[in-house]
A protein has these predicted regions:
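A C-terminal functional module that forms or caps the active site or interfaces directly
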Residues: 119, 131-144, 150-154
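Detector for outer-membrane/organellar transmembrane beta-barrel domains
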Residues: 7-124
Length: 189
């Protein structure tokens, strides 16, 4: 085979019960990739490392979380996908050269089926320094009874602002990104 990527990933998780209804959960992700063969590029790094973690406090009403991530070298996503860290945004770059991303958020459960999410994010890094801020808002509803039991509706809106000196779209980007998904899980017996 003339095109190979060697990849290793590890996830460590630990949950600590604080009370019958409260837990603290820590997650740490480590990832390393190295390109061999046709994917190697003389003008770009042929290896990268990613470290990312999240700390979540779970309560009966929802959860509060904080996460962070760091990517050493950006790589072509068709060769190696490094967009796997815990800080989440629909569109803000978290996957560039020397990039850091930090996020704090809350998930609030209005009912057992309906959850709201609010999660600001901050990013820094890249060859041409990108400084981004964003706010992710989301709603999730899961149908719990009737013929559509198991159907899940998800709607998220991301408000992003980035400072990218020299960007073809301008030095300051100010945008909305909206995503909706409908998922229906079922089992054949």
């Amino acid at each position: 085979q003339k095109d190979v990527s060697n990849q290793i990933q590890s996830i460590l998780e630990k949950s600590i019960p604080l009370d019958p209804n409260y837990t603290l959960k820590g997650e740490l992700l480590g990832f390393y990739a190295q390109l061999e063969g046709l994917s190697r590029n003389t003008s770009q790094p042929n290896e990268t490392a990613l470290v990312s973690g999240q700390l979540t406090w779970n309560a009966p009403w929802g959860s509060v979380f904080g996460s962070g991530g760091y990517l050493r070298h950006a790589m072509n996503g068709a060769v190696v996908d490094t967009d796997i860290g815990y800080p989440f945004s629909l569109s803000l770059d978290r996957n560039r050269e020397g990039m850091q991303s930090w996020q704090l958020g809350v998930n609030y459960r209005l009912t057992p089926q309906f959850t709201l999410t609010f999660a600001p994010i901050v990013t820094r890094g890249y060859d041409v320094r990108i400084e981004g801020t964003g706010i992710l808002g989301g709603m999730n509803y899961r149908v719990s009874e009737g013929p559509l039991q198991g159907m899940n509706f998800f709607l998220a809106a991301d408000k992003g602002r980035e400072k990218r000196d020299g960007s073809t779209l301008g030095d300051r980007l100010n945008y909305w990104d909206v995503k909706m998904s409908i998922q229906y899980d079922f089992m054949l017996k």
